[in-house]
Amino acid sequence: MLAVCYRFAHNREDAEDMLQEGFIKVFSQMHTFQNKGAFEGWIRRIIVHTCINNLKKNKRFNESLDIVHAHGVQVREESVPSIVQAKQIVECIRILPIGYRTVLNLYAIEGYSHKEIADMLDIEESTSRSQYTRAKQMLEEILIRKKILTKPKEKTEWLVAVR
């Protein structure tokens, strides 16, 4: 779960704070778990919501939204062939502005729909879609600049959300 928090946090200390706050919520809400679905999924949902609430509370999300462990991410082998590069991609995702990073994480990695993201972040569904598109574009530019990804000859979708 620390990896989940780390994707949303600015640094390890913030991630640890989010995780601690999330587990406090998990333990205080334990009586509400109804054995419908996986226990880990229930915990993950609480942790993700805790991270989102933390970003909102600290106004980090809204500020960056105004400016323009990668599990769940599939990278096409012909574009990015190595595990080392996959780790580099995760680090490049952390470079994205928090708004872009948050939407990218929620949609492509956590598997939320744009409607769910819009509800969680109090934004329009179209904003979620555009933030996701911009995040992918910015991430691709960063990866090309860092020579992790070669510029494709034709438009390809190399980052695909796993559903």
Listing of model-derived features with the role each one plays in the protein:
Residues 103-107:
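A short pre-motif secondary-structure segment
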Residues 11, 113, 122-127:
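Helix-turn-helix DNA-binding motif, specifically the short coil turn and the N-cap/start of the second
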